[in-house]
Amino acid sequence: MAIWQGRSLKKPSGGRIVLARKKRKRELGREPSNTRVAEQDKRKIIRTYGGNRKVRLTAAAYANVFDKSGKGRKVRIIRVIENPANRQFARRNIITKGAIIETEIGKAKVTSRPGQDGVVNAILLEE
């Protein structure tokens, strides 16, 4: 079933709002990508509003981790330690922006949106 992101058809009082038009395709949404930690990266290209394209990362194995000096490295993701978006995401190894991930070189905080950007960028946390 599609996700409709249009205005509610109910008034605050509970009464119905009768629209003078049908639902529009532009008001449709999609399920979240829920990027997981995996053995190799998996990307999906989807068509978006205006015929544009969005790269959706569905499975991630590597992250671009940057240190304080700005030097970056491509490192393997081991697991998700903490995720402020939802505490169940850490248990399910789902990566979102703001998640703390464990990598080969230490803990890092995700700064990109993997479901929107198609890549995991992170900054190294000092321990």
From Swiss-Prot:
Q: Which domain of life is it from?
A: Archaea
Give GO cellular component annotations, separated by semicolons: ribonucleoprotein complex; ribosome
Q: Write out the entry's keywords from A to Z.
A: Ribonucleoprotein, Ribosomal protein
Q: Which InterPro entries match?
A: Ribosomal_eS8, Ribosomal_eS8_CS, Ribosomal_protein_eS8_arc, Ribosomal_Se8/biogenesis_NSA2
One MF term in GO for this entry? structural constituent of ribosome
Q: Name one Pfam family in it.
A: Ribosomal_S8e
Tell me the Gene Ontology biological-process terms attached to this UniProt entry.
translation
Q: Which family does it belong to?
A: Belongs to the eukaryotic ribosomal protein eS8 family.
Q: Which HAMAP family match?
A: Ribosomal_eS8
Its assembly, as annotated, is:
Part of the 30S ribosomal subunit.
Name used for this protein in its record: Small ribosomal subunit protein eS8
* Protein source organism: Pyrococcus furiosus (strain ATCC 43587 / DSM 3638 / JCM 8422 / Vc1)
